[in-house]
Curated annotation (Swiss-Prot):
Domain DRBM: 334-402
Pfam family, one: Rota_NSP3
Site note Cleavage, residues: 333-334
GO BP term, example: regulation of translation
Molecular function as annotated in GO: RNA binding
Organism: Rotavirus C (isolate RVC/Human/United Kingdom/Bristol/1989) (RV-C)
The protein, known as: Non-structural protein 3
Family recorded in the similarity comment: Belongs to the rotavirus NSP3 family.
S-S pairs: none
Keyword flag Acyltransferase: no
SMART domains reported in the protein's UniProt record: DSRM (SM00358)
Amino acid sequence: MATQASVEWIFNVAGSAASSSLDKAIKDAGGSENFSKYVITKFYDNYKDCIDDSGVYNACIGRAKTIDKALNDPKVAERNEEWYTNVATISRLDLELAELKLMLSNLGIKREERVLNSMFSVVREKGRSSNVIMMKQNAVKMIEEGKLKIKVERNETYTESLKNKIEELECIIDAFEKGKDITIDLDAMNGEVKLDGNSCSYNSTAALVSTILGTPIKMYNESGQPLFDVGNYMNPKNIIEKMIELEIPIFKSDYRNNESPDFDSWNERSNLKIVSVNDCHAICIFKFENNWWCFDDGRLKKHNGAGYPLIVANSKFQIDKILISGDIELNPGPDILVTLNDYITKYQLKLECTFDIFLEDDGSITYTCYMKLESAEAIGSGRSKKEAKRIAAYDILDQLGI
C-alpha cells in the first residue's frame, strides 16, 4: 500500500528512468505489457515533444496524490473501474502511481534536455573540437512571439566595469536567430600602461582586451605587481590565457593566436591585432577608417606596417572610434556613455534603458534604445546596441543641459 510520502519517490527513480525506455521502466516496476502500451499511448506520446509541460507535471502530481488517498480507502479504489489494467484494483492503483512517478521523474529531469533539443541542434565541426549551434525554427518562432528569452549567464566574479562585454554577447545572441553577420563596433583604447621599457607584452595585451571589453582593464595591483602575472613568459599569448583563467570575459571565439590552425584566415580579416616588432617588442594595432593605427606602450600613432601578428581578434570587431587620454589633437573627448555614467554616479540617479530589435526590409537589424533619466526621455536607433544607446544618451544629456 502506498502512502502520501511515496510521491517523493518520483525523484529517486530518475536514474533508472533516464537510462532506460519508459516501457522497460514500467515493466521493472511490475507493470504488464498491456499496461506499458497503455501508459505510452495515453501519456508519453502526448507530452514527449511538448515544450511547456508544467500542466502535465501538475496533473501528474495531483493524480498521484489522489491515488495515494484511494489506496488508503478500498471503497474509493473500487469505484475507479474505468482504469485499464489486468491486475487487481489495489495493484492497479500501485502501478498507476508508479507510472505517474516515472513520468514525473522524466518531466523533472528530462525537461531541460527536451526543451533544448526542441530548439537547438549541435553540429560538430569535422576534425575540430569546436561546435556549431543551430537554432531551429521552433525557437525562432518563440522568440518572434516573445515566448523565449535568451540570456548570458553572468559569473558572479565579473565586475561591474565589464558590463559592455556582456552587452556585446547579448547583442550577438539577439541577432543570432536572424542568420545575419554580426558586427560589433568598438572603441579602441588602452588599458593600464606601465612605461618601464619592459612591459610591452602587458601593455599591448591590455589594449586589445580593453578594446574588446569596452572598458580600460586594470593590469597591476597597488604594489605595482601584474594582476595577470606570467613570470618570465611575458608573451601576449600567455597573458591573455592568464586573463581567461582568472575569469576575465574574453573567450576563445574572440581571438586566435599564431599557433591556431585557422590563424591565417583570421589574420586576413581581422581589424584588431597584437604584432611583434623585431622579435623584441609588442604593440596593439587596429584598422580605423581604412588606416592602420597602433598603441605603442600607450602612445597612439600611425602604424608603419612593421611586425608580424601574434594575436588577431575576430573580424566581427570593428573600430569606429579611438579613445585616448591627454591633450592630443586626435582626442575625440570623453565617450558620451562615460559622461552619462559619470553624471548618474555623481548625482546617484537611476537610468531606465530598454532595447527593441527590428528587422528592416533589406534584411538588416536595427536596434532601438528607449532611455529615461529623471524628466528626460530619448529614443536612439542604430546598427548596434552601443550605437543606439549613444544616440539616446546624446539626446538625454542635451535635455539636461550637460
